Structure formats: C-alpha cells, structure tokens
Amino acid sequence: MMLLDLEEKTRVLVEDIVERSAIGSGSIFVLGLSSSEVVGGIIGKASSREIGQRIVKTILEVLEPKGIYLAVQGCEHLNRALVVERELALAKDLEIVNVLPTLHAGGSGQLAAFDYMEDPVEVEEILAQAGIDIGDTSIGMHVKRVQVPLRPIISELGGAHVTALASRPKLIGGARAEYLADPIRKN
C-alpha cells in the first residue's frame, strides 16, 4: 500500500467515525493499531514504525482541530495501557503508569504517539466515547458503555481488518419512559 494512500484512507475513516459517532470537543477517541496487519503480516510479528507514524500523525491531524483527544492502545505486553496527553490524564484523574513503549511492547502506534503528542504519558485504562480498531486489536475494553458498533466506510487498511465503536448513554426507565434522539442511529 502506498503511504499517501494509507494516509488518505486513514483520514477518511477517522472523519467518518467521528461524524457518525457524534463526538465533539473534549471527547476521547481510542485507536487500536496493528501495523503488522496493515503490512499484511500477523499481529505483533511484522511491526512497522513508519506505518504507525503515518497513521497516528494523520489521526491527530483530524482530531486536534476538533478538540478531541487521542488515546493509543498498546498491546497485551503492556496490559493494553494507552498513550494520552498528560493534560487529559490529569484532568480525568487517570492512573499514570511508568513504561516507555517499544516496537514490540506497546507497538508502533504508541511509539508514534510519543513522537507526535506534546506531553505523552501511559495510563492504565480509559473510557473513550468512540474509537477505531485497525487490525483486530480489541479496543472494546476502553470504550464507554453502551457500545455501538459502527461499520467503517472502508473495511480494510492495507491488510488490516477495520472495525469501529461509538457509545451512547444507557436507556433506562422502560416502556413509560421517553428518550432523547439517538445521534448515532438517527432515530
């Protein structure tokens, strides 16, 4: 896959998910990324720092002007900890953990987050309002309930399968209750 094509498809994917998930300024968007899968390999076996940099930089270019925070999930070797801006970690009172990601412990996306974020830190867990999973890395543990699957307009990025999640408030009250319009499903 050509790198410019990778950047353009990443931009289209993220813009679509942000729009359909109805998130805005102050929201958190989680990224799960297997650069190994993007290049056609097996998750964790062919990590590419350059692929991680291209994808994370592109996502930040989409999210930052909207005031949306990016959280980059690491692999299971780091217990799926996430890289976020220190400002977010402090504002949300998130548990900061002491680890520096490597290509094979944390992954290319986390390394790129350390390259491109202003003051990156690792946090143990987070509850994001939406996110994208590039390469079947399983982001669900970091997306707030109630999770709503979104079918991305592009289903593969290179060799990686792409899925996405948004979240909505729980519906409570039963048959007599009335609800606000659902901005995700538009019904």
Curated annotation (Swiss-Prot):
Family annotation (SUPFAM superfamilies): TTHA0583/YokD-like (SSF110710)
NCBIfam families: TIGR01440 family protein
Pfam annotation, one family: DUF436
Record family assignment: Belongs to the UPF0340 family.
Source organism phylogeny: Bacteria, Bacillati, Bacillota, Bacilli, Lactobacillales
Organism encoding this protein: Streptococcus thermophilus (strain ATCC BAA-250 / LMG 18311)
Protein name: UPF0340 protein stu1894
Source organism, top-level taxon: Bacteria
